[in-house]
């Protein structure tokens, strides 16, 4: 593990600096427990309840954030989402990744990609030796690194076509990628002349390798999700197809031929969310997209099955820590 210059909290420090630059009081925020600190402060209804959104806003502006995590457990054990792509690379150890209805048992050499505004959760326990690389990136940024003959976003289309979020690397490819990530790590931390360009070169090499492996495996099958016949999978599929309508627990239970109490218990046990919570999250993610497309809040609330406009506003602010109007302002 000594090969890696640890930057476990480097991007948290960057976020703190960013928040200070826009006038947010960060005196009560510990960079080492940023997400937890934000959550606690937000629950107290302080002015920093907007921070979670602002962090997403910062990521969107920066285009790429990178860090190694060594023996650090995951904070979010329930479904959450981001406004950017997330790359999760298991260097050592193992973990469980849930992306909508899919479940992946991650091991050394596995790399997973979570698209923007996709419900997911990663579970890695701190009592086991683990090292993972986390990278948040913007698809447009990868496009900017591409050439007319080489599209660095090609692997995203391959994964989508194969209905998976996972690429598994051989031992040889794994060692090569570690070397590339270590080089990126050093360049990313450095402030020497030319290191901004070296970061771009390192990123280009990394995504060239990722694309090459994805293309080689295009015809193989590496999906290891929920049992395709599992009731939770069927429930999620039903919700994903119908969440824009006014679906109820009774409709879901009728579809699955199972009691409301039983499917509710299984769903909560498997996903960490209640069926209602999951459905609301799916609706709110679509609401963000509709807002950016110019739809009115009243039309969004009605078309997505919210009981009233005040109910929509309340749920939106609860989820994103910001009102729909503020969301549009910060998204400009």
Role assignments for model-derived ranges:
Residues 66-82:
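Conserved short histidine dyad/triad with adjacent acidic residue
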Residues 80-97:
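Short, conserved beta-strand element in jelly-roll/cupin
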Residues 163-172, 188-199, 208-237, 241, ...:
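Short, Lys/Arg-enriched, Trp-marked, Pro/Gly-tolerant hinge/linker segments that flank
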Residues 1-4, 303, 313-332:
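…primarily DNA-binding HTH/wHTH and HhH modules…
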Residues 237, 241, 246-250, 258, ...:
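Terminal helix-turn-helix DNA-binding modules in bacterial transcription factors
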Residues 109, 262-267, 311-312, 316:
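Short hydrophobic/aromatic patch on the recognition helix
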Residues 2-69, 119-186, 212-217:
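A hydrophobic/aromatic-rich effector-binding and dimerization subdomain
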Residues 101-116:
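Short acidic-glycine-tyrosine-enriched beta hairpin
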């Amino acid at each position: 593990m000594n090969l890696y210059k640890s930057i476990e909290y480097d991007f948290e420090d960057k976020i703190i600096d960013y928040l200070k630059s826009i006038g947010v009081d960060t005196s009560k925020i510990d960079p080492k427990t940023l997400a937890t600190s934000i959550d606690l402060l937000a629950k107290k209804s302080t002015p920093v309840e907007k921070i979670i959104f602002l962090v997403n806003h910062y990521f969107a502006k920066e285009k790429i954030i990178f860090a190694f995590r060594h023996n650090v457990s995951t904070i979010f054990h329930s479904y959450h989402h981001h406004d950017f792509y997330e790359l999760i690379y298991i260097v050592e150890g193992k973990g469980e990744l849930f992306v909508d209805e899919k479940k992946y048992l991650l091991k050394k050499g596995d790399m997973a990609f979570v698209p923007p505004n996709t419900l997911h959760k990663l579970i890695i326990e701190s009592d086991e030796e683990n090292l993972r690389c986390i990278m948040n990136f913007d698809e447009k940024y990868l496009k900017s690194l591409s050439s007319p003959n080489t599209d660095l976003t090609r692997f995203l289309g391959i994964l989508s076509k194969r209905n998976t979020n996972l690429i598994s690397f051989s031992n040889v490819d794994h060692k090569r990628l570690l070397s590339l990530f270590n080089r990126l790590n050093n360049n990313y931390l450095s402030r020497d002349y030319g290191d901004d360009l070296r970061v771009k070169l390192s990123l280009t090499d990394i995504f060239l390798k990722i694309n090459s492996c994805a293309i080689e495996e295009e015809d193989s099958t590496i999906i290891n999700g929920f049992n395709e016949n599992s009731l939770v999978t069927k429930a999620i599929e039903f919700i994903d197809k119908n969440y824009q309508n006014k679906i109820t627990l009774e409709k879901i239970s009728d579809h699955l031929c199972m009691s409301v109490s039983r499917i509710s218990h299984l769903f909560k046990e498997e996903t960490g969310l209640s069926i209602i919570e999951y459905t609301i999250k799916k609706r709110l993610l679509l609401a963000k997209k509709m807002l950016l497309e110019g739809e009115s809040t009243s039309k969004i609330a009605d078309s997505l099955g919210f009981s009233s406009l005040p109910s929509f506003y309340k749920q939106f602010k609860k989820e994103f820590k910001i009102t729909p109007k503020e969301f549009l302002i910060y998204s400009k």
